[in-house]
């Protein structure tokens, strides 16, 4: 079973979803009404929100963040390489790689929030009324649409992470040799994000 499905099963009484209100049930909404984006939280707040009783953020958001950290390390190595003494002729090469890496990092950070939003949409779809056949039909259609969107998020995380592997490979071959351990950590972060995203599909 996917992590998302396990979350749903953890709610023992499905009728409980009928009263699902993200403003009162999603912990980060309760903590900060004006600043809901996970990407704007501090590291400590993000960790505390993740460890709370709220089912979101969950594995999908963590996968995206793991990939973002890997991409960030790759960008760091490109910056260190671009400014390495004696490598002035390589500045443009590493700068272009760094720019691409920043775009990847930004996209993965966005996916942290998109995954949590997708899960919240599923919960809201389940909370729709089902008193008549028409309401049940509309509810089912919304559940299907929300679930499809939720599945597409980990696909996107994997796609973006594969792009970052190209950058990491270049840093391993041509980057500052003093940063090779950082390149290794970047690679493992991104590979972990890919494998973790696969779990959610």
State what each model feature region is.
Residues 84-94, 133, 176-180:
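Short, surface-exposed loop/turn segments at secondary-structure junctions
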Residues 8, 12-41:
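Long, contiguous binding/interaction regions
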Residues 115-188, 192:
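Amphipathic alpha-helical interface segments
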Residues 77-85:
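Transmembrane signal-anchor/signal-peptide helices with a preference for the extracytoplasmic
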């Amino acid at each position: 079973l996917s992590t998302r499905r396990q979350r749903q099963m953890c709610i023992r009484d499905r009728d409980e979803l009928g009263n699902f209100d993200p403003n009162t049930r999603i912990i980060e909404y309760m903590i900060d009404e004006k600043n809901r984006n996970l990407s704007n939280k501090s590291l400590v707040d993000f960790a505390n929100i993740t460890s709370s009783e709220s089912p979101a953020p969950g594995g999908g958001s963590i996968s995206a963040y793991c990939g973002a950290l890997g991409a960030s390390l790759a960008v760091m190595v490109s910056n260190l390489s671009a400014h390495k003494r004696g490598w002035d002729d390589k500045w443009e090469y590493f700068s272009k790689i760094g720019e691409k890496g920043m775009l990847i990092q930004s996209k993965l950070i966005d996916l942290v929030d998109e995954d949590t939003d997708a899960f919240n949409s599923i919960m809201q779809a389940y909370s729709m009324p089902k008193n008549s056949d028409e309401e049940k039909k509309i509810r089912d259609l919304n559940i299907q649409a929300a679930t499809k969107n939720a599945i597409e998020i980990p696909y996107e995380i994997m796609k973006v992470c594969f792009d970052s592997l190209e950058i990491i490979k270049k840093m391993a071959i041509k980057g500052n040799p003093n940063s090779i351990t950082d390149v290794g950590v970047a690679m493992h972060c991104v590979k972990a994000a890919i494998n973790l995203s696969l779990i959610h599909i």
